[in-house]
C-alpha cells in the first residue's frame, strides 16, 4: 500500500453501487460543493463585493413557501441560528449543450434535476457550522408544493429527492428538506454549474489528496498517481465527478470525496493567500453572482453580509461535514431511505447547540481515508504551582450514530483511490 493509505479503516454498511447520473448531473456537483464551501467560508469574502453585482444576483429570486417574514437586514452578524440550503441543478446552459449532447437536446432536456442538496446549519453562541449532504438517490416524502403557474401539487409519500426540483423548483426542494430534517430553512440558493469550475482556477487551484495506489476512472479520464495534487478547472470537474475512482464506486462513496474537496476549499478560502488578494476576491464574487439564484430572503447583499459575519470566525474543528444517514431501500437496492433514528441524534444536537463527534468513518462506503496525524512527543507536564486558575471546562460533544459519516474541516482525508 502507498504511504497515502489509511491510518484506520472501519467496516461500514455497504449499499449497492447506485446508478450513475448523466454526465450533466455529475458535472453539476462542481457547482453544488463549490458554492457550499464558498458560502460557508467565503461568504465574508464575497459579500461586500455583491453590492456591485446585486442586480444580476437578485434578478430571479425565489419566494419560499410558509416562511415567517424576516426582519430587515442591518449591519452586523445575524442574530440566532440559521439554515441555508444549497441546491445544484442540471440545467442545460447554452454554452454546455454541445459538450453534453443528448441530455441537453433530447426529450429529457427540460427535466431539470436537483442532484446536489446540501444543508448548511450555523448555530448561535458559540457559532458552529454543520454541512449535511443528502444522497441524490434518497427516497423521501414530498409535501404539496406551489408551482410556477400558481397551481399546487399533491403530496407524494415517496419520491427520489433529486426529482423534486421539477415539481416546484427551489421552494419545493426547500420545503421537502425542511420537512425531512425538522429544520426551519430561512435561506436557499439554486446553483448553476456553468462557470463555477473557474473558482478553483481563480484561487490558484485546491490541493487534494489521492490515497491508496492512485485513482483511475475511464469514465472521467482520470489516471492519477497517489499523493497531493492541486486541481483546477477541468481537473476539478474530473475529481468531483468521479465515482468509479473511489471507494466501492457508489454515489455514497463519492459524497465523502466531495466533502474532502469542500473541506480543503474552505481552508483555501480562509487563507491569507485569498483574503489578501483583492483581484481574487472580486473574481470569486463575480463567479458567485453569475451562478447562484437566491431566495428573496437571501437576495439582499446586506443579508449575505449578516450571514457571513455570523460564520466567519468559526474554528475549523467546529465546521463539520456529514452525510445524511441512510439505509438501503428494501424495495430497490439501488436507492436509499432515511435512517430517522440516526438522524434524530444529529437534529437534537443541533437544536441544543452541542459540539459534534463523528463516530462513523470519514466517508461512507470507503470513499475517503483519514490521514494519520504526524506523531508528536508530548512535553513533560510542568510542576503544579499554587494560585493558578482552573482551565475553562470543555463541553462534552454529542457522539453521533456510526451510520453518520463525515469529518471536520480540520481533519485531513485522502480519496480512497481505485486503480
Predicted regions and their residues:
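Non-catalytic, solvent-exposed segments at the cell envelope interface
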Residues: 2-419
Amino acid at each position: 500500500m502507498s504511504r497515502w493509505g489509511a491510518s484506520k479503516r472501519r467496516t461500514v454498511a455497504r449499499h449497492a453501487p447506485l446508478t450513475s447520473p448523466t454526465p450533466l448531473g455529475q458535472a453539476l456537483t462542481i457547482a453544488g460543493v463549490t458554492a457550499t464551501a464558498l458560502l460557508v467560508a467565503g461568504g465574508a469574502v464575497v459579500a461586500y463585493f455583491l453590492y456591485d453585482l446585486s442586480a444580476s444576483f437578485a434578478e430571479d429570486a425565489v419566494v419560499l413557501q410558509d416562511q415567517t417574514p424576516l426582519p430587515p437586514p442591518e449591519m452586523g452578524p445575524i442574530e440566532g441560528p440559521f439554515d441555508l440550503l444549497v441546491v445544484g441543478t442540471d440545467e442545460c446552459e447554452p454554452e454546455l449543450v454541445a459538450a453534453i449532447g443528448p441530455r441537453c437536446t433530447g426529450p429529457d432536456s427540460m427535466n431539470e434535476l436537483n442532484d446536489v442538496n446540501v444543508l448548511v446549519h450555523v448555530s448561535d453562541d458559540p457559532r458552529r457550522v454543520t454541512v449535511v449532504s443528502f444522497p441524490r438517490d434518497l427516497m423521501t416524502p414530498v409535501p404539496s408544493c406551489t408551482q410556477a403557474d400558481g397551481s399546487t401539487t399533491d403530496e407524494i409519500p415517496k419520491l427520489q429527492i433529486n426529482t423534486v426540483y421539477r415539481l416546484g423548483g427551489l421552494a419545493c426542494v426547500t420545503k421537502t428538506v425542511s420537512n425531512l430534517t425538522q429544520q426551519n430553512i430561512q435561506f436557499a440558493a439554486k446553483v448553476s454549474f456553468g462557470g463555477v469550475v473557474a473558482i478553483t482556477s481563480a484561487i490558484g487551484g485546491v490541493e487534494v489528496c489521492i490515497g491508496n495506489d492512485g485513482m483511475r476512472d475511464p469514465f472521467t479520464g482520470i489516471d492519477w498517481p497517489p499523493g497531493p495534487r492541486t486541481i483546477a478547472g477541468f481537473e476539478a470537474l474530473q475529481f468531483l465527478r468521479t465515482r468509479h475512482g473511489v471507494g466501492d464506486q457508489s454515489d455514497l462513496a463519492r459524497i465523502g470525496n466531495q466533502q474532502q474537496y469542500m473541506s480543503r476549499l474552505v481552508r483555501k478560502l480562509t487563507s491569507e493567500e485569498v483574503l489578501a488578494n483583492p483581484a481574487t476576491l472580486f473574481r470569486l464574487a463575480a463567479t458567485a453572482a453569475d451562478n447562484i439564484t437566491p431566495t428573496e430572503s437571501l437576495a439582499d447583499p446586506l443579508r449575505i453580509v449578516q450571514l457571513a459575519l455570523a460564520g466567519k470566525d468559526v474554528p475549523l474543528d467546529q465546521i463539520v461535514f456529514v452525510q445524511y444517514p441512510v439505509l438501503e431501500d428494501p424495495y430497490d437496492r439501488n436507492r436509499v431511505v432515511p435512517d430517522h433514528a440516526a438522524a434524530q441524534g444529529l437534529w437534537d444536537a443541533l437544536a441544543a447547540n452541542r459540539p459534534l463527534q463523528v463516530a462513523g468513518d470519514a466517508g461512507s462506503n470507503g470513499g475517503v481515508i483519514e490521514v494519520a496525524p504526524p506523531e508528536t512527543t508530548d512535553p513533560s507536564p510542568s510542576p503544579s504551582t499554587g494560585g493558578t486558575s482552573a482551565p475553562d471546562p470543555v463541553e462534552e460533544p454529542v457522539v453521533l450514530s456510526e451510520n453518520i459519516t463525515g469529518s471536520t474541516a480540520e481533519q485531513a482525508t485522502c480519496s480512497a483511490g481505485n486503480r
